[in-house]
Amino acid sequence: MSDKNEVSSLYPPPPPFIQFFTEENSKLFRECGKDEEKLAKCTTKQREQLKYFVKPELPRDGSYRAFGNVWKIKDELPELSQMGIEQLYRKRESVTELENGTTTEVEPSPQDSQSGTNYENKIQESKKLMKSLLLNFLELIGILGVDSSRYEKKLDEIRVIAINIHHLLNEYRPHQSRESLIMLFEEQLEHKRKEMEHINKVCDEVESKLAQL
């Protein structure tokens, strides 16, 4: 139990295999490296210690600890239901498809070029949540004016709405990043276009002056 606490502490101590990084082992690793013949001549203890000198592969999935917190390798936004929070907005705008005479509800993907209403729907839902937040705030003021002991339920409702707004904004960030990148590229293109126009203008002026000589 104490070992786990040490590993997960804010500033964990050096790993136990740090003791194998001696001058002798460092020299032996430089001489042997990954040469199987030279490694075969080493003792079993030396080969076990030299394994720690080989750089490990980067992890593809799972989680890791850093400064006392657990972080996932793949940075994914968890669902509100996974955090035990009620979701107050529609996840995506459903699309009705007709197949073999039957209708099915299909959720468009954010990467789908035909699902332009996906992010528009997020904007609409965020506006609804903001209006709901203002309404609940006014109701909270009314409750405090009548009976201040009944504020806890309304305050919890406001907390859930605020978390939903925050989560919805985080879902919108990929679209915001893409639009910001498009704006940056457009600014760079406009800047290069102006530079080309200026260069062409200077070239025309030089040619006209040379023609007058």
UniProtKB/Swiss-Prot annotation:
Keyword line: Activator, Nucleus, Transcription, Transcription regulation
Here the segments flagged for biased composition (Polar residues) are 97-120
In this record, what's one Pfam family?
Med7
According to the UniProt entry, its GO molecular function terms are: transcription coregulator activity
Chief location: nucleus
Q: Which intervals of the chain are annotated as region Disordered?
A: 96-120
Q: Name one GO cellular component term.
A: core mediator complex
Write out the GO biological process terms. Answer: regulation of transcription by RNA polymerase II
Q: Where in the cell is it found?
A: Nucleus
KW Flavoprotein (keyword) present: no
Job of this protein: Component of the Mediator complex, a coactivator involved in the regulated transcription of nearly all RNA polymerase II-dependent genes. Mediator functions as a bridge to convey information from gene-specific regulatory proteins to the basal RNA polymerase II transcription machinery. Mediator is recruited to promoters by direct interactions with regulatory proteins and serves as a scaffold for the assembly of a functional preinitiation complex with RNA polymerase II and the general transcription factors.
Give the multimer and partner information: Component of the Mediator complex.
What family classification does the UniProt entry report for this protein? Belongs to the Mediator complex subunit 7 family.
Protein name (database record): Mediator of RNA polymerase II transcription subunit 7
Q: Which organism is it from?
A: Kluyveromyces lactis (strain ATCC 8585 / CBS 2359 / DSM 70799 / NBRC 1267 / NRRL Y-1140 / WM37)
